[in-house]
Amino acid sequence: MSTYSTKVDEKWQKKWEETSLYKFDENNLEKKLYVLEMFSYPSGAKLHAGHWFNYAPVDSWARFKKMTGYNVFQPMGFDAFGLPAENYAIKTGIHPKDSTLKNIETMEKQLKSMGAMFNWDHEVITCTPDYYKWTQWLFLELYKNGLAYRKKAPANWCPSCNTVLANEQVVDGSCERCGTEVIKKDLTQWFFKITNYAEELLQKLDELDWPEKTKAMQKHWIGKSKGAEVTFKVDNSDLKFDVFTTRVDTLCGVTYVVLAPESPLADELTKPEYKEKVEEYKLQAQKQSEIERQSLTREKTGVFTGSYAINPINNKKVPIWIADYVIYTYGTGAVMAVPSHDERDFAFATKYDLPIVRVVEGGEELPFTGYGPLVNSGEFDGLKGNKAKEAIVSKLSENDLGRWKVNYRLRDWLVSRQRYWGAPIPVVYCEKCGIVPVPEKDLPVELPYNVEFNPTGKSPLTTSEEFMNTTCPHCGGHATRESDTLDTFVCSSWYYLRYADNENSDAPFDKEKISKMLPVDKYVGGPEHACMHLLYARFITKALRDIGYLNFDEPFLSLRHQGLILGPDGQKMSKSKGNTISPDDIIAEHGSDVFRMYLMFGFDYAEGGAWSDDGVKAMSKFVDRFSRMIETAKEEINNPKNSKTDMGKEEKELNYVRNHSIKAVTEDMDKFQFNTCIARLMEFTNSLSKYLTVDNKNIKLLKDTTIDIIKLIAPFAPHFAEEQWNIIEEKYSVFNEKWPEFDEKALVKDEVEIAIQINGKIKAKINIATNLSEDEIKSAALADDKVKAATDGKNIVKVIVIKGRLVNIVVK
């Protein structure tokens, strides 16, 4: 019978807690290892299999590191503000605070049932005033240093619900709640100046131990482009506008220019006879998301304004159009169109019968997007590539109509949310003093409990007069609080800093302590956060460094992503599909460690895969078998029937597998290849089980090997391993033990099995000494009885030896 069950889980969890086994030693930072999993959002009532796939394997890696001598800091908390709790409140009437704290209580129990090595005394919960006080402090620091500002910007607006929607709430251009078409509405909102750090965010990526795909995604998101900014004057007007282009060499081929529908110039440039069509087009553009507008497969549309611009290089008049594929917040919100050398411009010009003029030689047909000698470009004809660009920019700069420019796709971070369940923005508005930041001594600006959640067209906080009406900290007169709350990504942009000093009531963290504890050594979470959370956290770290609070450049030195656990049907798990897996049910039946080990063995950690109930059952059988093996080993160790001290063939074979397993598991653990680690453990289990059937055993080797295999399985099955360790060693705890080291000498075999082929087909396998010469190997192969029988009466033409693997005998 197996000695493992949920009772074993409970027994050892209680013991670990009583003895503070995993307490981080803040006075011993020489071998500090900060291991961090992205904290979870308590929107659902319980953790699902995906959470476990993030947390359990990383906990195994942390345990392994503890056993190799590291002082592991592995905190846990909850990203507790956000939209789902507020939507749940609108739907059910249950207050977000009540539902969130209840869910956190449930999830804490689940996480503890995992037996993870979390430092719970460092827990942070972002919706508590003692946390968001410092989120508000962060806002004020950025504001004081010119990195937070307020401006008008378009937001998703549902006319039916009378509320702003996050991008995630817009599905196919409609409100996910009521199905009404979403429009864009200009609102005055708060931004963080992440663009100030665009170049550093880009350059520092190459120094990080991060997945290449994630680094590539951030590089694309930042989107650095080197080119030129060209000024176009409007014909018969004092108006002018700039365009950014990476192909200034094609400037003579511009046959029209395009403005974004949101551009303020659109109204000024539109002639009266075109006004109605332009307004209608702008209204349609408001209903499209930026992703839809920039789609390469979507047919391009536009409308003529009736105005013309002057091409600054040849003084030709070109029509000014409005088109929704131009985004106002990217670049200058205007583009020059060269249909002969750009596919999008070519399609647009063809559709609207606009001129197409070739200015670059090359290609059999248009559009030709490569480089070549210029044609139809006046004084620049014959110039090519960079020389053409330099000559044209030089000419433009003489008249202040062009200049070199570096452009970034990255835009400033919009942090305002017209929602309730978030950290209040700590500013007030005074008629006399204007925008006034709340003094730090008055933080936190607490979120009121009694508010009206149902959408009214205004931020929910405006329904609380007690909250909104306040006194100006500057003049003492009447003031009104900001009614927007902060994006939840602001809360998660700095939580890794608070973990290290979570009980500090005087500051968000102690600078000296942080300088020793940070940066995070290993960070693990989903790849979907590449261009938001991971980018925002990098920005906040750099901003706080420059303000003087941090002495490091990057928050996360090493990053790993986990894959996705799918339902048994291979589809993404969801309640509506009925394919979700409850960790609680599996733990109740098989125990926490069976669940952990199945997650690590059944899937490549970076890839994930489809769930299998049979896989869980197979892992349960393996744990039972391992348990029986340890019981047998204990009996043999305590009551040896026959014992020897020398190292015979069986001992050398076991010792080889033992040391090979230690080496392989150690190396694969650091690669996060948990599935191969457990495969090695299974091979090791087979080898030790086989040795237990030998009559005359080396008891010292048996005990040492049994101790090592328990140590190796400990990170993967911590409760189970403690129980097995207690059986063999009868002392506490296996996690206070040193990780086993392999012996290089034991990895050199005295004998090796080789295959013998005759004309390419395997006829026999023999064991030979590893130090035999090639001639000796040939002789051993030809002396085998099966080989003799197969070659009898035949002419041996050639004998080919591949050392350590095979002998191929060619006969006729």
Curated annotation (Swiss-Prot):
CDD domains: Anticodon_Ia_Leu_BEm, LeuRS_core. GO terms for molecular function: aminoacyl-tRNA deacylase activity; ATP binding; leucine-tRNA ligase activity. A motif ('KMSKS' region) lies at residues 572-576. It is an enzyme of class 6 (ligase). It is found in: Cytoplasm. ATP binds at K575. The keyword Lyase does not apply. A motif ('HIGH' region) lies at residues 40-51. GO terms for cellular component: cytosol. The keyword Electron transport does not apply. Belongs to the class-I aminoacyl-tRNA synthetase family. This is Leucine--tRNA ligase. The lineage of its organism: Bacteria, Bacillati, Bacillota, Clostridia, Eubacteriales. The gene is leuS.
